[in-house]
Regions:
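Extended substrate-binding grooves/exosites of carbohydrate-active enzymes
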Residues: 1-190
Length: 190
């Protein structure tokens, strides 16, 4: 099978295997898809139609980290946003959400990932934003980050859903940030 045919077959198998699972709310078609090489827009449209044929009862969604036509194919769109962690401040999320909603009021907006790293060994009195790529990840910044992001999200009824990244710290061999190499330390629980 070609890459695209294989992807379609996997989507069919996924939906047929899990269509009756009580925790399935929607079918996700991509996460942080980068437009390198062939333009994926037509393929994502085909997957969207296929998902609807297999299960007309659930919406489709996608998780994006960029602008572009990809964001207008699925029923819902969610963005992976780390405002206040990878540069900027938590308030940047408010600006992003408000501008996106103003420009596209018909689109249902979600936040598919948001989070900040922390170490139980890193404590500080001041509220100073750390460098995400640095070794110092104080817990009080992670707490502030989540409190500020939640306020921003809760004040916007047009946001259909949010997903914290992540419940637990987890292994990620390529990570060299925080006080433990090979760990993504964005977990709410260490």
């Amino acid at each position: 099978l070609s890459f695209r045919e294989n992807g379609k077959q996997q989507l069919i198998e996924l939906i047929r295997q899990h269509y009756n699972h009580p925790s399935i709310c929607f079918w996700g078609l991509f996460n942080e898809l980068k437009e390198v090489g062939d333009n994926p827009v037509e393929y994502i449209k085909e997957l969207n139609v296929l998902a609807k044929q297999e299960d007309p009862t659930r919406p489709t969604t996608s998780a994006s980290n960029q602008n572009g036509d990809l964001n207008f194919i699925t029923d819902n769109i969610a963005w992976n946003r780390y405002d206040g962690w990878y540069g900027s401040t938590p308030k940047t999320l408010a600006t992003f959400l408000d501008r996106t909603h103003e420009k596209y009021p018909e689109i249902r907006i979600g936040i598919s990932e948001y989070g900040a790293g922390a170490s139980i060994y890193h404590q500080q009195d001041s509220l100073r934003q750390p460098s995400a790529s640095g070794w110092w990840h104080p817990e009080n910044w992670q707490t502030y980050y989540h409190m500020e992001n939640w306020k921003i999200i809760a004040e916007r009824p047009f946001v259909w859903g949010t997903f914290v990244w992540n419940m637990f710290d987890f292994g990620a061999a390529h990570r060299t940030e925080g006080d433990r190499p090979g760990i993504n330390d964005k977990g709410l629980v260490t």
